[in-house]
Amino acid sequence: MSKRTYQPNNRRRHKVHGFRLRMRTRAGRAILSSRRRKGRKSLAV
């Protein structure tokens, strides 16, 4: 029996999908701007 792959961890969650990480790269800022344009309630984790 294999183990479940999703092992929740808030620190890793923010390091991988967080707002600061998105702001760091040009591609990440593009993600945020497209989510703003779409009107997402939450932009990043």
Curated annotation (Swiss-Prot):
Belongs to the bacterial ribosomal protein bL34 family. The gene is rpmH. The keyword Manganese does not apply. Gene3D superfamilies: 1.10.287.3980. Keywords: Ribonucleoprotein, Ribosomal protein. This is Large ribosomal subunit protein bL34. GO terms for molecular function: structural constituent of ribosome. The keyword Ribonucleoprotein applies. It comes from Nocardioides sp. (strain ATCC BAA-499 / JS614). One of its GO terms (biological process) is translation. GO terms for cellular component: ribonucleoprotein complex; ribosome. PANTHER family: LARGE RIBOSOMAL SUBUNIT PROTEIN BL34M, MITOCHONDRIAL RIBOSOMAL PROTEIN 34 FAMILY MEMBER. InterPro entries: Ribosomal_bL34, Ribosomal_bL34_CS.
